[in-house]
Design a protein with these regions (language model features):
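Short, structured segments at the rim of ligand-binding sites
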Residues: 1-421
């Protein structure tokens, strides 16, 4: 179903349960490629298009999988393919997370460079640089990466940018490298810790320290293990903002509150009242937000994956808010769609200037990427009248059953097929 229709204006009320984190599930699924003739079992795997794409990739490489509810078992044979199929890598950038484990486990891999997307170019130069420092020979011909390494060797690696994917690829490569690898200036997103737990379960010594430095002692062979995917802090935050933007009372369950500190701090600044439980947060009705200034940056800063949703929420604030995007070059394309709904957003360089308005009006809009689509849904929930959101395929990549979850909170939501073009 590629179109979502929302009739806005209803304050949302009720409880919504958070899915397993997309951005934790994808790397830990890729880590199964390190196994030889063993099994990885993951609990709390979300049912998302991106997860299905990763499953297709793993199946192409020779992994057999079994899903029982949100428990997934990955059985990896002694021999697997080391060539990642082009159509899957082009479809999802996270396929590049096969690079590190395949190279470490097979000694070679062939993987197309991932394409860019609507939020900017998405190179993997930091991934490749780290692998070459560990002894890999890497060539790029016609957009395909040819990597070869008889034995990766542990060493100190400094990341020019705390890239999430580069951190994850190098951690997985280091698991089978000879000796110790120390990665400096790593990403510190909670998803990194989830991957570290899986590698520890596989018998690898991983010391993350939580300070942006990861120490890994490589092993000859990794063991099978079982791990749980952490809750999706971005999905959870999106539903918190659905409560805020509609002036409702929403409880988001199954979260790790500490993973949402940056959002909660900004909501407190904006005058939102909320209660934080051990694994839930409840937001209470607020008439109108106060404007705030935000800089989207690597964790523990305000998450770039929540920047579009926060901008949508601030379109109705009582004053001028500023939101700077410091991670991606072009993550404001959705603002034009919000302005078509009556928002007043001006983009100056890497900053959105949001002049709060009294109300938004429903319109026909288009989701350009996953989080842009989420931002449009939030705006539609608050807007007067009906909004039609096209290209929902982007939203299904990262939000499990969002129509059902929103309906359960009282939203007037309907899905339909796009007309034949
Ligand atoms: C992960 O992408 C997430 N995806 C993204 O979530 C998230 O926005 C991003 O981290 C930042 O938090 C998954 O985990 C599957 P990066 P990733 O490497 O690993 C540049 C979503 O909405 N860079 O931290 O690709 C890059 O161009 C998605 O769920 C290089 O220049 O992000 C970008 O500007 C969107 N060279 C910045 O760093 C590299 O080798 C952050 O990239 C790698 C990255």
């Amino acid at each position: 179903m590629d179109v979502m229709r929302i009739r806005g204006g209803t304050p949302l009320k009720g409880v919504v349960k958070t899915q397993g984190a997309k951005n934790a599930a994808l790397p830990v699924m890729a880590s199964c490629l390190l196994l030889k003739g063993r099994t990885l079992t993951l609990e709390n795997v979300p049912d998302l298009h991106d997860v299905s794409t990763m499953l297709d990739l793993l199946a192409c490489l020779g992994v057999t999988m079994e899903r029982l509810g949100n428990r997934m078992t990955f059985s990896v044979p002694e021999e697997i393919s080391w060539e990642a199929p082009e159509h899957l890598v082009r479809k999802m950038r996270a396929s590049s997370l096969a690079l590190g484990p395949l190279l470490a486990r097979c000694g070679k891999t062939v993987l197309p460079l991932p394409g860019g997307c609507s939020i900017g170019s998405r190179p993997i130069d930091l991934h490749l640089k780290g692998l070459m420092q560990m002894g890999a020979k890497i060539e790029i011909r016609n957009g395909i990466v040819y990597a070869q390494a008889d034995q990766l060797r542990g060493r100190r690696i400094y990341l020019d940018f705390p890239s999430v994917g580069a951190t994850e690829n190098l951690m997985m490569a280091a698991a089978l490298a000879k000796g110790e690898t120390i990665i400096e200036n790593t990403a510190r997103e909670p998803e990194i810790e989830n991957l570290a737990s899986v590698l520890r379960g596989m018998g690898v010594t991983v010391d993350t320290e939580g300070t942006g430095c990861v120490r890994i002692k490589g092993v000859e062979e990794v063991q099978g293990c079982r791990e749980r995917v952490i809750p999706d802090r971005i999905e959870a935050s999106t539903y918190v903002l659905a409560g805020v933007i509609t002036g409702g009372e929403v409880t988001v369950d199954d979260i790790v509150p500490a993973h949402m500190d940056a959002l909660l701090a900004k909501l407190e600044e904006a005058g939102v009242r909320f209660h934080v439980g051990s694994s839930s947060v409840t937001v209470f009705p607020v008439r109108r937000l106060m404007p705030v200034s935000i800089r989207a940056m690597p964790y523990p800063g305000f998450p770039t994956d929540l920047q579009p949703q926060m901008v949508a929420t601030l379109t109705l604030a009582n004053g001028v808010s500023l939101v700077e995007e410091s991670v991606f070059q072009a993550r404001f394309l959705y603002s034009e769609e919000l302005n078509r709904m009556g928002a007043n957003i001006t983009i100056k360089g890497d900053t959105a200037i949001i002049q709060g308005v009294e109300r938004l009006q429903g319109a026909s809009v288009r989701a350009m990427d996953l989080r842009a689509g989420a931002a449009l849904i939030l705006a539609a929930l608050a807007a007067e009248g009906e909004t039609r959101i096209d290209e929902m395929v982007h939203v299904w990549r990262g939000y499990e059953a969002s129509d059902k979850k929103l309906k359960a909170l009282g939203a007037d939501v309907a899905l339909e097929e796009a007309e034949e073009k």
